[in-house]
Amino acid sequence: MANSQVLSTDQISFFKESGYLILENCIEPDLLATWQEQFWWCLNSSFDDPDSWPTDQTFIGRWRFTPPCPNISAVPMVQAAADQLSGGNFIGGGGAPIIKWPDSGGQWSLPRSSHIDGYGPPSQHPEGGLVLGATTNLHDVESKGGCFVYWPGSHLSTYDYLVRHPEQINGSFLDNEGWNYTEFSKGATEGPTEFHAPAGTVILWHGFMCHNGSPNVNTTPRIGIFGRWHYKKLEEMRYDILDDLWKHWGI
């Protein structure tokens, strides 16, 4: 499937306009069940036993599931979609689980702030070169359940900002006095939107799309699996997009 065209023309157009694309039933039930089993075995815990949840553990570094699908990028439909979008110019895709444990007595609201990946500490991200993300949940997630939150269309307003301030594409916008990511998200076509969906649904999102986490006031944990891709020729390509956002994509 990795070499097949799994995305339609309409899906690609939607992705380019909105900055994200939701793929339903993307992960086969058997694979999803295997991932769930491995995850909870690693935590020496059980989804069905809240007393066993290690709520102080919110991130598992260097995580890999058992082959042939050690991470989200190896899921056949995800791999094929990423290859189709990238035209072969992206690498990466691995990512660790990020856990939002329930706080049923907490207060819930959509986040007001956001960020884009790729401009954090070098140990975390290749600065300025992340272009595509993918997120799925190991279990069903409902609204207010610790959802991944995104600002539709903000990839274009982020890009517009960098076109107007090309010297800041290296991440120096973070040094601006009083910097706030609303400089990017204020041009979004919609406000912050929750990604809540059945387990095995995947959202693909552009690397310039503003996003954030959110509180979980439901009764079950949100186990998010993330993948991120960056340019193969990182140093060359990350600065070479100011004339065309899609210059090094396959679409």
Language model segments and positions:
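Non-heme Fe(II)-dependent double-stranded beta-helix
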Residues: A2-E17, E24-Q124, H248-G250
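Short catalytic/ligand-binding loop motif for oxyanion handling, primarily in non-cytosolic enzymes
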Residues: L32-A33, W101, S143-K144, Y159, ...
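Non-heme Fe(II)/2-oxoglutarate
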Residues: S45-P50, V163-R164, A199-L204, F208-I251
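Active-site rim elements
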Residues: F65-N71, P121-P122, T182-T193, N212-S214
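Short edge-strand/loop segments of extracellular domains
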Residues: K100-P102, W151-T158, R228-L234
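Short, structured patches in soluble enzyme cores that scaffold and shape functional sites
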Residues: I116-G118, T136-D140, P152
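Short, conserved beta-strand element in jelly-roll/cupin
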Residues: S123-S143, H196-A199, L204, R228-Y231
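Double-stranded beta-helix
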Residues: V141-C210
